[in-house]
């Protein structure tokens, strides 16, 4: 499962198109080997997207670890937000660009190792983070988002209870005001707003 946090593109390409229904809206996505959830939208990402209050999402949005692009494309197609999408995986970036065109959305997609190429601040950072990288890097991603959120910005992410949802929530309370947006079959969707004590 090197695709979770890997620039490797040596695995042979085998592009396929999957059709996905999200909140009764149909999307087509080109997927490939060495990208996350290549057979279709995974349950965690679906849980996160379907619980979002799209009317409240506006301004600048970052889709962190975009993969082939379902999160950013869904948000852009349903809001007036300016959406940036990043991933470390070159194949995922190329697929996301193809899928943005396929779904007729105007988004900005670029490669970044965590936040290395991110130069602005966002109203929302939204992610199904790469859990299998381990807690050290996971926390670096989640806490690191603080530096890239605007004053009242929010980090929204999904994580399974078996992957440490509750311990992650408790850890993030040191940095954010944390709310549970959704719980579904072991998946937790958290919204984390900057703690008022943190500039």
Segments (PLM) and residue ranges:
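Core SAM-dependent methyltransferase catalytic element
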Residues: 183-199
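Conserved SAM/SAH cofactor-binding pocket of Class I
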Residues: 44-127
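Conserved SAM-binding loop and adjacent beta-strand
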Residues: 32-49
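Conserved class I S-adenosyl-L-methionine
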Residues: 160-176
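Conserved SAM-binding loop
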Residues: 85, 157, 181
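N-terminal auxiliary segments of SAM/dcSAM-dependent transferases
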Residues: 1-23, 34
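Conserved beta-strand signature within the Rossmann-like core of class I S-adenosyl-L-methionine
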Residues: 152-159
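A short glycine-rich, Lys/Arg-flanked "PGG" loop and its adjoining helix->strand segment in the class I
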Residues: 139-151
